[in-house]
């Protein structure tokens, strides 16, 4: 992929005064600007995104415009670019710290978030929007999906991945009164669940909830698949891989949807 300049935003409301941040958004900004907050994509997620993008780009005879929203440190974006050469990729993230890391990879980058006031991108500009393990971090998922749909061309693809609240091990943990993996009750520490790292997850989804939300926001032709989670203990990894065949209980939900 190669970098490309994006057209200026022409959506309704462009140029209007930005609304003032609410206190929770300020706290989230501080959380994501902290160098200790994880922004790395990890090799599994990077390869997964590259494969999803390759499938979405099949049949394009001209260079497609791809927006990777929530690109983090750019590692996954860079791999996707290398494996899908000839298309235009732009990485977007609201964290200046994450973008400082991503710039070392020579990517085209924009500091912006998918929540209000939205992306500095004209309506119906993008062929593909990637939201790889992003939606669980957002305060306003409705506005984010509205914005993704706004910038997509008719029939354009939304590629989305997110941890599964109903993963096979979470079903057992919840039955035992243990907080499910991936879910969080605080940005300051981990309480009541396995693990020690705070990731900033604000929303969690089952397959049914996620597909219902996407359909309500004007996306159709939903294709859902499952993926494994890299932190599953070694002895349980074959089981985690097997559950990928049953997306409703897989560790990670992968969705390819199209703008209706």
What are these regions (language model features)?
Residues 63-72:
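Conserved class I S-adenosyl-L-methionine
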Residues 19-48, 75, 94, 101, ...:
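S-adenosyl-L-methionine-dependent methyltransferase catalytic module, highlighting the catalytic core
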Residues 117-128:
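A short acidic, Gly/Pro-enriched loop at the edge of an enzyme's catalytic core
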Residues 44-62:
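Conserved alpha-helix/loop element of class I SAM-dependent methyltransferases that forms part
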């Amino acid at each position: 992929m190669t970098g490309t300049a994006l057209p200026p935003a022409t959506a309704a409301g462009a140029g209007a005064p930005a609304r003032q941040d609410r206190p929770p958004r300020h706290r989230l900004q501080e959380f994501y600007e902290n160098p200790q907050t994880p922004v790395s994509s990890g090799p599994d997620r990077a390869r997964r995104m590259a494969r999803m993008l390759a499938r979405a780009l099949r049949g394009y005879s001209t260079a497609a415009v791809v927006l990777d929203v929530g690109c983090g440190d750019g590692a996954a974006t860079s791999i996707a670019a290398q494996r899908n050469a000839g298309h235009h990729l732009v990485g977007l993230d609201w964290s200046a710290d994450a973008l400082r890391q991503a710039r070392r990879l020579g990517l085209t980058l924009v500091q912006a978030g998918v929540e209000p006031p939205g992306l500095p991108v004209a309506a119906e500009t993008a062929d593909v929007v990637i939201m790889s393990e992003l939606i669980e971090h957002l305060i306003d998922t409705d506005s984010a999906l509205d914005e993704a749909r706004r910038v997509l061309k008719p029939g354009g693809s939304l590629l989305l991945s997110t941890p599964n609240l109903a993963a096979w091990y979470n079903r057992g943990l919840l039955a035992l009164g243990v907080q499910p993996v991936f879910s969080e009750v605080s940005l300051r520490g981990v309480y009541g669940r396995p693990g020690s790292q705070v990731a900033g997850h604000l929303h969690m989804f089952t397959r049914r909830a996620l597909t219902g939300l996407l359909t309500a926001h004007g996306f159709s032709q939903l294709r859902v698949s499952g993926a494994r989670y890299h932190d599953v203990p070694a002895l349980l990894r074959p089981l985690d891989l097997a559950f990928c065949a049953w997306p409703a209980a897989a560790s990670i939900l992968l969705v390819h949807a199209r703008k209706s």
